[in-house]
A protein has these predicted regions:
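Glyoxalase I/VOC metalloenzyme domain signal
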Residues: 1, 6-25, 44-204
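N-terminal low-complexity or amphipathic/hydrophobic leaders
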Residues: 28, 35-47
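A short beta-turn/loop motif at secondary-structure boundaries
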Residues: 32-35, 110-112
Length: 204
C-alpha cells in the first residue's frame, strides 16, 4: 500500500472534515495540471499517506479527469488505493497474464508549495471487473515520498476491500503481487481504519 485516495466534492471542505474527524489538518498539495484535480495530503507513516482529492474549479477545461468518479461524487468516500512498485512494465505483464487491460505507464507530476517537483508514473487497470483493484505507482528517482513531508499524527490501522466475489479478487490480487484483506459484501467498497489523535476512525 502506497496511499489511499479520499474523494471529496470540495477540497477545502474535505480538509475541514478530515481535521474534525482525525485532529490532523491535511496540507494542500497542489494541482494536477491538465488532469482537472487538486489535492491535500496527510502522512500515515511508514511511506504511506492519505490523499484528499477533488475537482479543481480552476481547471474546468482540463482534457482529462484524474478520477472520473469525482464528477458524480455527492459525498466524501474512499475512491481508490495505490500500490507502489519498482517496475510498472512487470506489473503490466502480470495484469495481461490475467486478461486485465492496462492504461499506462503514464507520467505524472505536481509542483509543491516550495517549488520542488514530485514526479511519478502510474499504471491503471481497465475492464468490467476492475472495480476495487488498486492502481500502481512508481516514484521517480530523486523524488521525496509525500509521506515524508506531509502532516503526521495518523497511522493506518487496517484496510480491506469489500467485494462480491472474494475468491476472484483474492486470486487476482495474488497474481498482481498484491497482499490485501478481502471480505465478502453485497457491493464493492474500500474501507480503512485510521489510528488518530481522536482515536480510531473509519473511512469508506
Amino acid at each position: 500500500m502506497d496511499h489511499l485516495v479520499f474523494g471529496v466534492p470540495d477540497l477545502a471542505r474535505g480538509i475541514e472534515l478530515l481535521e474534525h474527524r482525525t485532529g490532523v489538518r491535511a496540507r494542500f498539495g497542489g494541482q494536477h495540471p491538465g488532469r482537472g484535480t487538486h489535492n491535500a495530503l496527510m502522512s500515515l507513516g511508514g511511506r504511506q499517506y492519505l490523499e484528499i482529492i477533488a475537482i479543481d474549479p480552476m481547471q474546468v477545461e482540463a482534457s482529462s479527469l484524474h478520477f472520473p468518479e469525482l464528477k458524480h461524487l455527492s459525498e466524501p468516500r474512499l475512491i481508490a488505493w495505490a500500490v507502489a512498485v519498482e517496475d510498472l512494465v512487470e506489473t503490466a505483464r502480470r495484469a495481461t497474464a490475467q486478461n486485465i487491460d492496462t492504461i499506462g505507464p503514464l507520467a505524472g507530476s505536481r509542483a509543491q508549495a516550495d517549488g520542488s517537483l514530485l514526479s511519478w508514473q502510474t499504471l491503471r487497470l481497465s475492464g468490467p471487473r476492475t472495480e476495487g483493484l488498486p492502481f500502481f505507482i512508481e516514484w521517480q528517482k530523486g523524488t521525496a515520498h509525500p509521506s515524508q513531508h506531509s502532516p503526521s499524527g495518523c497511522t493506518l490501522a487496517s484496510f480491506e476491500v469489500e467485494h462480491t466475489d472474494i475468491e476472484w479478487m483474492r486470486h487476482t490480487l495474488k497474481g498482481l503481487g498484491v497482499d490485501a484483506n478481502v471480505v465478502p459484501s453485497a457491493t464493492v467498497r474500500l474501507k480503512a481504519r485510521l489510528q488518530t489523535p481522536k482515536g480510531e476512525v473509519e473511512f469508506g
